[in-house]
Amino acid sequence: MSDLVKSSEVIETTEVPPHNNNNNKRHFKYDSEQRKQRLAGGVKLKDALMILCAGFALISDGYQNNVMSMMNKVFALEYPKEYTASLSTQVSNASLVGTIFGQVIIGLTADYIGRKWSIVTATCFLIFGTMMCAASHGKTVNGMFWMLTIFRGVTGFGIGAEYPSSSVTASEAANESVKRRGGAFILATNLPLSFGGPFALCIFLIVRRICGNHLDAIWRTMFAIGCFWPLSVFYFRLKMVTSELYTKSAIKQRAPYWLALKYYWPRLIGTCVAWFLYDFVTFPNGIFSAGIISNVIPKSEKNNLEKIAEWNLLLGAIALPGVFVGAYVVDILGRKYTMMIGFCGYIVFGLIVGCGYHQIKPITGLFIVFYGLMMSCGNFGPGNNMGLTSSESFATPIRGTAYGISAAIGKVGAVVGTKTFSPIQKNLGDKWTFIIAAICGLAGVLVTFIFIPHLKDEDLLEEDVKFKNYLIDNGWKGKFGIQEYDEEEDLEGSSEDSSDGEIVKNNTKNDVEKVDALK
């Protein structure tokens, strides 16, 4: 059988298997010249707006993920008898459980229904859930906390929905005309997520000054402010257009999930397990950071909300530069090695703080610096690259689903980490939370090395071509793209009108006939 023409930019070429006797089987061929032409034209306005609209509201996700850090302290002061450790875990985990459902369900619909529908749905859940959290009430304090728990779950569903819909949309938009796609993706997605933590603390300090000791007003205001970011981009998200990649490669009917699993299972294991390990460390350290800090500051400041928030803000400020450094090097080193370096940071700083905990604890500033550097390494490596790798490792027809599953397994890690954090502190001691972080870092290095592919800035369309040819070779008979193509017209199309991919028909004379397949 004939080999496909090998392009200088194509890392792998797809061939019809030698044992395949079907000479009428059609295949796609990746055309690297089309991508060169796209990139030569510079960043298009529509692509830039799609990236910004997809990522901007993730500030709200970062805000919601981190707001509970200080709210746990506020609730403990306002309701010292009712707000027990188990209730604190219940309220904190409600968002994470909702996030898991949002990631899986909206991940599926992002592929099956569409990117725009999914991202608008995510925005609606975020706005509604956050507003109802601020309005939580009940006949009893426990009743109020149950309402808060339920609507933290609704908010979590919106947060989870944002992950696959926003990240996949940003990745596909960046692929169209952005040369250093990895850095652009990180600045549009993980930067808002990471900035949400310090932003939440800045808002808390302002609200605390305004409201004084009116703790009820503080927590209701803090939840209500979370509506602002999704509201600010809601109109623009309604006007978003569908990416070219999704238009060309979507599978609307009879999605071949079993074939996809057989093809992508090593990558799916890598993204799921690595994300589980990352969230197992970073989420409890974010949610309970106020409690961790209150254990190392002087006793006179343990219940001083402003002091705790200020130290927490310093912690977030030290962790944030990891996002920028990681965004700069990710297209140079590649996703895989950047992730491995970040996990190594968990090993180094986790062991420094854990093994030297009792020596470092009396020096609050030094403790915060080492703690912040550990979190910064998390941002530099897996924090930046889990979303990026999950959106680039899979073809467009299943990208949302695979991303949603990977992120959901990550949030399972967050739930497990949050649930076990307090028992670890109580039974093993505070230092073991950092030693376990180092162990997770070692596991993350191994998983990344074995299962995560070495990606830099490859065209996402190239992965689509490989996956389409794999489906064809395995007898799948469905259609690609939003529009249904007439097969006779496809076979009669000219190569001069071809876009980024072409269909190749192998005949008995081993000739290669190029025809247009992606208009």
Swiss-Prot record:
It is a multi-pass membrane protein. Glycans are attached at residues 93, 175, 506. It is found in: Cell membrane. Residues 487-500 have a biased composition (Acidic residues). PANTHER family: CARBOXYLIC ACID TRANSPORTER PROTEIN HOMOLOG. It comes from Candida albicans (strain SC5314 / ATCC MYA-2876). Induction: Phosphate levels regulate glycerophosphoinositol transport activity and transcription factor PHO4 is required for GIT1 expression. Expression profile differs significantly in isolates of high, medium, and low virulence, being the highest in the most virulent strains. This is Glycerophosphoinositol permease 1. InterPro entries: MFS_dom (IPR020846), MFS_sugar_transport-like (IPR005828), MFS_trans_sf (IPR036259), Sugar_transporter_CS (IPR005829). One of its GO terms (biological process) is transmembrane transport. GO terms for cellular component: membrane; plasma membrane. Keywords: Cell membrane, Glycoprotein, Membrane, Transmembrane, Transmembrane helix, Transport, Virulence.
